[in-house]
Amino acid sequence: MKILYSLRRFYHVETLFNGTLALAGRDQETTGFAWWAGNARLINLSGKLLGAHVAHAGLIVFWAGGMNLFEVAHFVPEKPMYEQGLILLPHLATLGWGVGPGGEVIDTFPYFVSGVLHLISSAVLGFGGIYHALLGPETLEESFPFFGYVWKDRNKMTTILGIHLILLGLGAFLLVFKALYFGGVYDTWAPGGGDVRKITNLTLNPSVIFGYLLKSPFGGEGWIVSVDDLEDIIGGHVWLGSICILGGIWHILTKPFAWARRAFVWSGEAYLSYSLAALSVFGFIACCFVWFNNTAYPSEFYGPTGPEASQAQAFTFLVRDQRLGANVGSAQGPTGLGKYLMRSPTGEIIFGGETMRFWDLRAPWLEPLRGPNGLDLSRLKKDIQPWQERRSAEYMTHAPLGSLNSVGGVATEINAVNYVSPRSWLSTSHFVLGFFFFVGHLWHAGRARAAAAGFEKGIDRDLEPVLFMTPLS
């Protein structure tokens, strides 16, 4: 047992039991980790762990490529993306690939190319994962010290952190370059109902960009979720990319300060817990972003937001009844409030009825009808365009309020289409994953802190069935 290639494979930073503990003649060294411990057996095998990560990346990219081609094969140009159960093509369309005015798909070939490129990439990653998992060195420290590491090496860990930050920064700049130089991105706010355009006037003013972080998360404010123009989004990615790259360089060139060395637990499982916490926060933010934001996630591709569908319903019936002779400026509803229009507590003119709760919605089909004090009555009477009517009628019947069995729509809308909006899927999945990752953070953080404190942790394996089975060999 003691003469294997690397003794370190049997001396883990995190162990299920302390090194001296023996139960029923079994100890950590002879039994290893339980089957349910996943990659824990690779904690100190940097080469094998690299293989696991590369193979995992290959599986992810393979799914992306395969699902991409599946969606292309099933795509029907005559129907909106959000009615077809598509979850990948809306992202490609948002980046400006294959779409024209109004979000109409004019070319599916870029989507096909994307799928094929992902499949080819997954093959490369798959071969790399198999090589490092089965054929490559178990540990990298001896053969390739630059890629090797010891979990307790604080300086090496912050160097790895720095490399990751630089890669994230470069990823942010990829979006910037696409928006500025490589065809532009889809802007739902472009005049006449949205179009692909290059971003020419970036918002780089720090008071604007960081002002979003200082806003309230509640109605009318909306924190960063309230961003509603692409100049701010792309400018924010310039700031984000720059901060990530500069922060990465900082972490590569420096060593952790004394307070950081004392404050953090420096072990593989601790890093896992930190990562899960960060991903959990990202998941919760993304959940709100997808649900409420129709600029980064255009309604032409993802379907309307909930507030947008509700406001669209009020707008559609205002248009109908106005043509039938109703005076939409003065008509009263059953509660005595305005039936079509009313004033908010701050005096702005907003839609009446149950949709009053969504008074702070901003949508490209509605904003042209606003004046300095909310909705403009004269514009509502004279300036409504056919494309606004068509879009609001479409959104009215496609609220993202469906259950998973597709029974959905605004509760008061009898014409609602039974479908599951990709906005619902994206938002719900990110909330659920964000929650699971938070629980994972608590679990692994607790184990890592227990290991650092030197007391017992893990699930008792004394009665684990596999320990009573005949050895396979």
Swiss-Prot record:
| The keyword Acetylation is annotated on this UniProt entry | yes
Keywords in UniProt for this one? Answer: Acetylation, Chlorophyll, Chloroplast, Chromophore, Manganese, Membrane, Metal-binding, Phosphoprotein, Photosynthesis, Photosystem II, Plastid, Thylakoid, Transmembrane, Transmembrane helix
Give the cofactor note text.
Binds multiple chlorophylls and provides some of the ligands for the Ca-4Mn-5O cluster of the oxygen-evolving complex. It may also provide a ligand for a Cl- that is required for oxygen evolution. PSII binds additional chlorophylls, carotenoids and specific lipids.
| Membrane topology listed for this record | Multi-pass membrane protein
Q: Where in the cell is it found?
A: Plastid, Chloroplast thylakoid membrane
Instruction: Note the subunit structure.
Output: PSII is composed of 1 copy each of membrane proteins PsbA, PsbB, PsbC, PsbD, PsbE, PsbF, PsbH, PsbI, PsbJ, PsbK, PsbL, PsbM, PsbT, PsbX, PsbY, PsbZ, Psb30/Ycf12, at least 3 peripheral proteins of the oxygen-evolving complex and a large number of cofactors. It forms dimeric complexes.
The free-text function statement in the UniProt record for this protein reads: One of the components of the core complex of photosystem II (PSII). It binds chlorophyll and helps catalyze the primary light-induced photochemical processes of PSII. PSII is a light-driven water:plastoquinone oxidoreductase, using light energy to abstract electrons from H(2)O, generating O(2) and a proton gradient subsequently used for ATP formation.
Please report the name of this protein according to its UniProt entry. Photosystem II CP43 reaction center protein
